[in-house]
Regions:
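C-terminal extensions
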Residues: 1-29, 33-87
Length: 87
């Protein structure tokens, strides 16, 4: 499953979060209920974590959630997450 792929994600950069801290990730354009569940399964729960995604991490996440290559970057999740944090 998706959770098994969490090992490939660079959490040293993203930071670790728990389900109790989770943000409504569907606020980000490009994330629907299905993808949100996959991100939660990976251990990605917060805007803060998503805002810290580098191009490498975006690709790691793409692979882990079986998304189209480049999709996370194209939808600018990191930029959107940063904007929600500043709001």
């Amino acid at each position: 499953g998706v959770a098994a792929k969490a090992d490939s994600i660079d959490f040293a950069t993203l930071g670790v979060a728990t389900a109790s801290e989770k943000d409504d990730l569907q606020t980000i354009k490009g994330i629907g209920p299905f993808i949100e569940e996959k991100l939660y399964a990976l251990g990605i729960y917060t805007f803060s974590q998503i805002s810290k995604m580098t191009p490498e991490i975006e690709e790691e996440v793409n692979v882990a959630i079986e998304f189209f290559p480049g999709r996370v970057k194209r939808d600018e999740w990191a930029r959107q997450a940063s904007e929600f944090l500043q709001a």
